[in-house]
Amino acid sequence: MATSLQTKYTLNPITNNIPRSHRPSFLRVTSTTNSQPNHEMKLVVEQRLVNPPLSNDPTLQSTWTHRLWVAAGCTTVFVSFSKSIIGAFGSHLWLEPSLAGFAGYILADLGSGVYHWATDNYGDESTPLVGIHIEDSQDHHKCPWTITKRQFANNLHFMARGTTLIVLPLDLAFDDHVVHGFVSMFAFCVLFCQLFHAWAHGTKSKLPPLVVGLQDIGLLVSRIHHMNHHRAPYNNNYCVVSGVWNKVLDESNVFKAMEMVLYIQLGVRPRSWTEPNYE
């Protein structure tokens, strides 16, 4: 009497910590054998889409509101940059606005680190003004690679809002080309810091050669320098513009000192003290 044995092997997902909407699809493999001779083993591979494809995840897609904020942010930065260039042509003084722009670039990296440290370690989705970004930050630490799947305006719109609301009044209030040399470069780096951050999670083969070149010479934060931020103890390499401040801040324990002060004064523990290992 023929006896058939059917065994089903289900490939369990290895991304248990990944939110449901971000988990990739997995396969169910069915292997069927028959004890009778001259019967071949049959392998049936059935693909089951457990969740929608990541590319269709609405949380990663841009909306028209996102695009409008990014357009507004770019416009305010362009106006500031134009005032700096026009003023430099008119006065024939290029050194001062150039130095101001360099200072803006350097301080933007520092600012990105302080902001990144704060949102990584304190607050939650109910925090005023930045709650949505704190929630996104925590999701990013659970699934770092998803930042490379975010559409352009989706990734930048939050920083674009802040840039617009701060730079627009400065555009209206000041015409000094040195002031705008600093403002335009600082605001540009803040506006696009999440793009630089996403590039730091990309692979060289998928990045534009110009971006890879800027990363290699240290003008933009690179994958090599940023990857340590996503490794235990999750309390370093917070700066995401150029990363030039990371070594200074980490070796001097600036953030650790700030965490101790906040804990002693307010009793608030940073998340990095108890951060689970997401790897």
Swiss-Prot record:
Pathway annotation: Lipid metabolism; fatty acid metabolism
Bilayer-crossing regions: 68-90, 98-118, 178-198
EC class name: oxidoreductase
GO molecular function: oxidoreductase activity
BP terms from Gene Ontology: fatty acid metabolic process
GO cellular component, one term: chloroplast membrane
This protein's record includes keyword Transmembrane helix: yes
Membrane-topology descriptor: Multi-pass membrane protein
Protein name: Fatty acid desaturase 4-like 2, chloroplastic
Organism, as annotated: Arabidopsis thaliana (Mouse-ear cress)
